[in-house]
């Protein structure tokens, strides 16, 4: 703890911190996952989840179940928890909680714009959007032909508006430009969130700095790997990296010139916190990289609960619940497709 935060935190934040720690206690354990892995069909999964926090959300769902139904209902639990915390929060906690949903808003914008580019039905796309990232004018995203129109017609009245200053070009929207837009928006969002947490100070600043720096570094690695072999120049690649994190600035200089996965690995192994992640991979492969990053993120998120009187527990809980939903989606898909031998390939255990 820092200063006298502990003396005053509980006045406005104590109730919600108790609530979120209660939610954390309701996350699935390793024993739950072991039981889920034994399920023979989706109804078995529903039956096991009926004894968890997801029970009330799935109890009225008729058979036959689909994976999308399970994911949708479990996501509804996450959304309800978030809305309850947000309506109880006062400043600056309410602003902190709002920041948590901006990433989903960016993903929804990219989903709608990409789907429209490929002539998908707008209503179908909206149904696939994450509920935490919804905003009033989201359906009108389909009319935009370039970045300027996207901003002027739709996004100027959303919280994402300040992040668009680097994206305002008249270039037509194509797959490459949309992906650049996504990463530019995420860069601006992460830097803004990081600066906000620094202003809060104390344990919140310390823990969130670590969590957001890890997120920024992971995105830098993914941007590098995904842009290898594309027409994106080294300078353009470097512009997409966030201006903070363990890799900033020298790691970014090296990542910008990488031309294959082994060169990326060589850069990352110079940083002790990331050596363990890349040691799990054989040379030339990147399939296990996402899981290794998720495992490291979960470890850091769980550590956020070791301290009290800070806001990082809210961020950590939301991320852990999202990881849990990804786990349930993977398990459900494997069971539905009779691929139970692959269940452990992507499940990230928490407790």
From Swiss-Prot:
It is a peripheral membrane protein. The keyword Transport applies. The keyword Kinase does not apply. It is found in: Vacuole membrane. Keywords: Hydrogen ion transport, Ion transport, Membrane, Transport, Vacuole. Its main location: membrane. GO terms for cellular component: cytosol; Golgi apparatus; plant-type vacuole; plasmodesma; proton-transporting V-type ATPase, V0 domain; vacuolar membrane; vacuole. One of its GO terms (molecular function) is proton-transporting ATPase activity, rotational mechanism. InterPro entries: ATPase_csu/dsu_sf (IPR036079), ATPase_V0-cplx_csu/dsu (IPR002843), ATPase_V0-cplx_dsu (IPR016727), V-type_ATPase_csu/dsu (IPR035067), V-type_ATPase_csu/dsu_dom_3 (IPR044911). It comes from the Eukaryota. V-ATPase is a heteromultimeric enzyme composed of a peripheral catalytic V1 complex (components A to H) attached to an integral membrane V0 proton pore complex (components: a, c, c'', d and e). Subunit of the integral membrane V0 complex of vacuolar ATPase. Vacuolar ATPase is responsible for acidifying a variety of intracellular compartments in eukaryotic cells, thus providing most of the energy required for transport processes in the vacuolar system. Belongs to the V-ATPase V0D/AC39 subunit family. PANTHER family: VACUOLAR ATP SYNTHASE SUBUNIT AC39. This is V-type proton ATPase subunit d2. It comes from Arabidopsis thaliana. The lineage of its organism: Eukaryota, Viridiplantae, Streptophyta, Embryophyta, Tracheophyta. The gene is VHA-d2.
